[in-house]
Amino acid sequence: MRVFSVNDWEPLMEVIVGRADFAYIPPPDPSMKNFRFANLSYREISKLIGSYSDKVISEANQDLEDLSDKLKELGVKVYRPKKVRHDAQIVTPYWKTTGWHNYCPRDIFLVIGTSIVEVPSVMRSRIFETWSYNEILHEAFAGGAKWFSAPKQMYNDSSFNFDDLSKPTLMNNEILFDAPNVVRLGMNLLYQVSNSGNEKGAEWLQSMFPEYKVIVEHDAYSGAHFDSTVVPLREGLVLFNGHRVSPDNYPKIFEK
């Protein structure tokens, strides 16, 4: 595997497509509430715990297989993670949870140039999600990629606050962010502060990639992820999600 990418519009050569097998909704905790269910009570979230239905998993896997087949037809080399049990318990000295899924590799890996970053995802249940991709990562490393993992965080309860849902519920106590909080624009990295990424995440990213400019965006959207809000299609053309971005709050890097 050869790794090099600085944007999302160049021709695609290789890609990882996830899996839906054994997807599991973990027990509620502040990190899960922050990312998915900030407006629900813990009692309401508890009703969701457990495996996704066979129907959902089967249909999701069929979609992923169809996507993989189509990409291969177009000449793209496709990699798939291992199937793993996501209901296995994860225990630390401070909390316990289960896994979630390995459906979305774009959530947990950020490619910047020749580097692959295992990001410090905002959910406790994703702390070991990258393990199912280990064989792929070793192949990338053998091909010359720089592979490193962000510092493992403690995911303290104090890292999340739900007093004001009009603001990000992720606090700035630890280095936490998901890869889709970053929109890659060549040597500029547009970083969204939201429920899925805080300012310390941006500071850490800038310290690791001093040759790039990390541009922090606060105002566009406080929910999870930025790549469904701002989509650069090519140089000079960007697609905005009109439900989240307006002429008053769009990222100023896109001003003419």
Regions found by a protein language model. Give the residues of each.
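The feature marks the mature, well-folded catalytic cores of soluble enzymes
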Residues: 1-256
